[in-house]
Amino acid sequence: MGKKLFGTDGLRGRVNIYPMTPEVALRLGLAAGTYYRRKSHRSRVVIGKDTRISGYIFENALTAGLLASGMDVFLVGPLPTPAVSFLTANMRADFGVVISASHNPFYDNGIKLFDADGFKIPDKAEHKISEMILDQSHTWDYPDPSSVGRAHKIKDALGRYIVYLKNTFPSTLSLEGLRIVLDCANGANYKVAPLALEELGAELIKIGTDPNGLNINHQCGSLFPEYVAKKVIEMRADIGLALDGDADRLIVVDEKGIILNGDQIMALCAQDLMRQNKLPGNILVATVMSNMALEVFMKEKKGALIRSNVGDRYVMEAMRKHGAMFGGEQSGHLIFREYSNTGDGLLAALQILRIMKQYERPLSSLAGLLQLFPQRLINVNVKQKRPIETMPTLLKTIQRIETAFSGRGRVLLRYSGTEPLCRVMVEGESDSKVNTYAEELADIVAKSLAE
């Protein structure tokens, strides 16, 4: 086994190839159960999953390990990642588990853990659990046969989550009169999102609500918002909403078919929260990938943009550290801390719809707050992940480009925490310069890390 199990968002990989094997899942159940089991009470864990066919494999393997460790297991079935975060706290569980590979294709899967308050578990807990999994000589502290866990299917989990979501939307408003194109990516939100939005009065045009175990994220969802954009124009809809496979991220399309990224939505929501005095210190947390225009926008509003590492768990860590109530990622993870401890695509959609209803204005006129700096992101496939500082040619090129920008541009290189990729991002005021520099850097990265 390799030394590192957990990436930036838990375990993830191709099904039946290490680490995404039944054996690892079983040991993970034993390890997590051992770590979180409490002698003071009957310990319990909530397990949810998305719609991948392989979910059955890992659900059963994890359950076996958890039961053997003495944990009671509450199975909620296919539900969004943020629903499991909510239910873990709501049901007073000791921790929660989500089986999902988010926006990845069906042949991948993953496992991520939440603590008792619905936060993604910290690095320290991941490290301890990893140690137990990787140590093949580890002796498990099995409980007495009379103290092993019991498994329960929770039939009202979906209803509990819908009630919670609807309570984040003002009771004085409804979605009547709004035509919404909704793409659920054939993923975890295929039931919840249509039910919640229709109960609030919306007219829906649905895409990606017929999962078969193999079609999750397949030419649908947040990675393919152009399909939603096309449908918005065709159906003359007011807005398009594209979720990913586990429904923790959201991409929005306005009534003109223009695709809005997370930075533009963060500006809209941050301004709304500032108007309500619900953004303490006017602090917004975003990642190193967010556009410089968002930084400029917050300064103009006498606020501050605090940048974190990539990953909604790191956004939340920065939010907790700085007392921020709102944060997110350019990729569409949005965290409204008043309501949730993790990114929630549908909850974010409800906040945007509320703003549209309250101001009685089309989304295009509300979301045009940012003049985005030209930005180019190139994902380079790599066979190794050498530290950037050990590649002198690359470092010299970065230094030359940053000097040329004179403080009006940025260069960012980072390895994906879940895929064999190096992400090369260049941002500046000139489209042509940004593209030239990005391609130059990507070429150096490709040549340096191809073997």
From Swiss-Prot:
Known PANTHER family for this protein? PHOSPHOGLUCOMUTASE (ALPHA-D-GLUCOSE-1,6-BISPHOSPHATE-DEPENDENT), PHOSPHOHEXOSE MUTASE
Q: What is its EC number?
A: 5.4.2.10
* Native species: Lawsonia intracellularis (strain PHE/MN1-00)
Where, by residue number, is the active site? S102 (phosphoserine intermediate)
Under what name is this protein listed?
A: Phosphoglucosamine mutase
Q: What does this protein do?
A: Catalyzes the conversion of glucosamine-6-phosphate to glucosamine-1-phosphate.
Spell out the post-translational modification annotation for this entry. Activated by phosphorylation.
Determine if Metal-binding is one of this entry's keywords.
yes
Do the record's keywords include RNA-binding?
no
Q: What class of enzyme is it?
A: isomerase
**Cofactor or coenzyme needed:** Mg(2+)
Gene Ontology, cellular component aspect: cytosol
